[in-house]
Amino acid sequence: MAKSHQSVTMVELFYDLIFAYAVGRMAQTLAVPVHGMIAPQVLVEFLLMLLVFWTIWTFQTVLIDRFSHHEVTHNLFTLFNMFWVIVLSTAINPDFAKTKWPFQLSAAILFLSLASQYGLLWRRKHSQLAKTFGITLAACSFVILISLFIKPYTLSFAVFFGGVLAAGLMPLLLRNVLKATPADLGNLSTRYSLLVLLIFGESIIGVAETIYAGLSLQAGLFFLVVILLFIAYQLVYDNGLDRRQKTAGLAVIYLQLP
């Protein structure tokens, strides 16, 4: 009998909505045009910040997908993480030096929270995946906390993003461990598609705000690009994935990032 897919809970949908809001707010805060152009430095900063949010969200989603952790404890952790995601998003400032303490401290707390969830699962289920991810996330949280006390500021941020990048790439190095606990591709792809859909919605809202201020060719073209990207994504989602496979799910995880 084929394994039935997990259903997405209301708490998870709420969590995804908060993340979509955070990504949208981050884009609005950092994408401040200078002479009608977005500076390359701002684009790099946006991508680095996006990596932080994506890594946190991915580890939470992998935990739910692998272990079907729909319990009171999991819901409490999720609600706790929601609060810190909001703090993380409101801490973003175009002047990164002012962002350092609230942003990096919030990220450290979130990684430590995720490490605790994986640690509890390891104690209960003795899963090698839960143990490895728990240690990885705890180490990342420690590196982020250390980065808070490093000077100058540029070196502090380099250490911070180095820790986040190492955590984000860790699943690629643990392919065999992930295969030992196969992904529920139906659930995993649904979660990612819902988040992408919410982010597309945030983009449309951003266009609507500019249209309200006055119609422009630029706003119309941006709206068209968003719609075309959405259609392309839907075609790939509907036709490019065999959800019956038992895989590590790495393709679903990493191909969603671009």
Where are the model-predicted features located?
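Short, hydrophobic transmembrane alpha-helix segments
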Residues: 26-41, 62-65, 94, 211-213
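A structural signal for hydrophobic alpha-helical transmembrane segments in multi-pass membrane proteins
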Residues: 10, 14-35
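Extracellular loop-to-transmembrane helix junctions
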Residues: 36-52
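Predominantly late transmembrane helices and immediately cytosolic-facing juxtamembrane segments
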Residues: 3-9, 17-18, 47-61, 67, ...
